[in-house]
Swiss-Prot record:
This is GDP-Man:Man(3)GlcNAc(2)-PP-Dol alpha-1,2-mannosyltransferase. It is found in: Endoplasmic reticulum membrane. Present with 3140 molecules/cell in log phase SD medium. The gene is ALG11. InterPro entries: ALG11 (IPR038013), ALG11_N (IPR031814), Glyco_trans_1 (IPR001296). Residues 42-160, 182-406, 428-548 are cytoplasmic. Residues 161-181, 407-427 dip into the membrane without crossing it. It comes from Saccharomyces cerevisiae (strain ATCC 204508 / S288c) (Baker's yeast). It comes from the Eukaryota. Pathway: Protein modification; protein glycosylation.
Length: 548
């Protein structure tokens, strides 16, 4: 990345606006004022409050329950810990391995799930963890701190200036957390980087760990803004707003002790933003052991897999269901009469009435406008996981069309179930998941995926390393009209190409995908990486500070 991206300076800002000393002096004044107020506030907290009262009570309970002295308090900052999504799975698996690592480890969860009249208790939350993720946790060593100000990090609270509003909200929420119970280690598993300066400047040194799912601002966002016609005070104001925000965001990296990301795409962006060469990737726990075990127990004999593709994705526009359906309709029109058509199953959850309306619009559009026969497409909403497992075990292909999805856990679930992934050639699916792999455990040591894909379809026989197929679309924001058409087909053409593959090719690739998913994305792999990249370094850091 060039200096235009990494080395933001006020000369650039002034060049946009013609400001001379005004912008610089104003920002310096604001920064100095914040520093002074922070110092005054810390002194007031130290002299007027007893922020360790809850911690003392908690430690007494922890010692009584686990029978260990000198416990270490790991504070997990996750205001929406009961949401039940992929981010929460990371949280609870990290909690699980942290507890199992050492009997002296105690967990504090900073959560806002106990307010706003919600009928939620710690027991409810841990029961949900068991039901949703099948993790049995030692509840005697898990404590919850209620955050009454969680609404300050909700995007609906900030109708305008959402980025800075949520940033300020996270700082306040971090202070509400730490003033009730300061931990020995602060771990943010949800992605609120503006909370780190509050933790770093508290009454004592607290190591900070971040597990980042995606950056809150990226080069892509800034490049998109810079390409806008620079006319009018509104555009100039947004440039200043985003540049100053990015400048502050960059400075936060110095506050963090351990930086963990969930994918190569996120890791590359975070390295560029925080100028850190120590970022580590820990892939989310995908429980591939359970899917592979289910497949082995209730396996699919030859001929039992159906000629169908499943789309496992929440019903939200960014998942690009419309693109998939439209491509499928084009595929059906171009399919020779002698070839059996694939059936398409759209399976996902809905969160609101808006999502329900979205599904209905897709159904109406596919039936009334695109004229897709009803027996070739179905929409399955909010299925329990056992029904999803059956669909995965019966299907042959799994489709994911999201552009620049930072990871893509559904794609991993496809592979663990022995499916052939058909995915968009970007971010997580391209860089991390559907990568070449052979029986010797070699990952990504082959030519680029698009070259392998061309060779695969040219020979129509298994090559021992391909794990899935890619497409790109002219509607992609970053579509290269010169290179991309030569490398990747569009989705409708890819549907046509996969109809040429015989059963043996698909069976061999599906079996390879299962072994690959165990090797790279299992819960056990997450446990090992969390121990190596987080727990062991933190223990060394705490020991050094005790000696120092």
């Amino acid at each position: 990345m060039g200096s235009a991206w990494t080395n933001y300076n006020f000369e650039e800002v002034k060049s946009h606006f013609g400001f001379k000393k005004y912008v610089v002096s104003s920002l310096v004044l604001v920064y100095g004022l914040i520093k002074v107020l922070t110092w005054i506030f810390r002194q007031w907290v130290y002299s007027s409050l007893n922020p360790f009262s809850k911690k003392s009570s908690l430690l007494n309970r922890a010692v009584a329950s686990c029978g260990e002295k000198n416990v270490k308090v790991f504070g997990f900052f996750h205001p929406y810990c009961n949401a039940g999504g992929g981010g929460e799975k990371v949280l609870w698996k990290a909690v699980d391995i942290t507890l199992r690592k050492d009997a002296k480890n105690v967990i504090v969860i900073y959560s806002g799930d106990f307010v706003n009249g919600e009928n939620v208790t710690p027991e409810n939350i841990l029961n949900n963890v068991k039901a949703k993720f099948d993790y049995d946790l030692d509840s005697d060593r898990i404590f919850f701190i209620s955050l009454k100000l969680r609404y300050l990090v909700d995007s609906s609270t900030w109708k305008h200036f959402t980025l800075i509003g949520q940033a300020i909200g996270s700082m306040i929420l971090a202070f509400e957390s730490i003033i009730q119970c300061p931990p020995d280690i602060w771990i943010d598993t949800m992605g609120y980087p503006f909370s780190y300066p509050i933790i770093a400047r508290f009454l004592r040194r607290i190591p900070i760990v971040t597990y980042t799912h995606y950056p809150i601002m990226s080069k892509d966002m800034l490049n998109k803004l810079f390409k806008m016609p620079k006319k009018g005070i509104k555009v100039y104001g947004k440039i200043l707003y985003w540049k100053v925000f990015m400048l502050i965001y960059q400075s936060i990296g110095s506050k963090i002790d351990i930086v963990i990301t969930n994918s190569t795409w996120t890791n590359n962006h975070i390295k560029q933003i925080w100028q850190s060469n120590t970022c580590k990737i820990i892939y989310p726990p995908c429980s591939t052991e359970k899917l592979v075990d289910w497949k082995q127990k209730f396996g699919t004999a030859k001929g039992e897999r159906l000629n169908q593709a499943i789309v496992l994705a929440q019903f939200r526009p960014e998942k690009r269901h419309k693109l998939i359906i439209e491509s499928f309709a084009t595929f059906l029109k171009n399919l020779p009469d002698s070839v059996s058509p694939i059936k398409l199953i759209m399976a996902g959850s809905t969160r609101s009435k808006q999502d329900e309306n979205y599904v209905k619009s897709l159904q109406d559009w596919s039936e009334n406008v695109l004229k897709i026969p009803k027996h070739l497409i179905s929409f399955e909403k909010n299925l329990p996981f056992d029904k999803i497992e059956i669909l995965l075990n019966k299907s042959t292909f799994g489709v994911n069309a999201m552009w620049n999805e930072h990871f893509g856990i559904a794609v991993v679930e496809y592979m663990a179930s022995g499916l052939i992934p058909i995915v968009h050639a970007s971010a997580g699916p391209l860089l991390d998941i559907v990568t070449p792999w052979d029986a010797n455990g070699n990952i990504g040591k082959a030519p680029p995926q698009w070259e392998l894909q061309k060779k695969y379809f040219a020979k129509l026989e298994d090559d021992g390393e391909t794990t899935g197929f890619f497409f790109k679309e002219p509607s992609d924001p970053d579509y290269n009209t010169t290179k991309d058409p030569l490398r990747y087909p569009n989705l409708s053409d890819l549907f046509l190409q996969i109809t040429k593959l015989d059963y043996d090719c698909l069976r061999v690739m599906g079996a390879r995908n299962q072994q690959y998913s165990l090797y790279k994305f299992s819960d056990l792999k997450f446990d090992k990486d969390w121990e190596n990249f987080v727990l062991n370094p933190i223990c060394k850091l705490l020991e050094e500070e005790e000696r120092g």
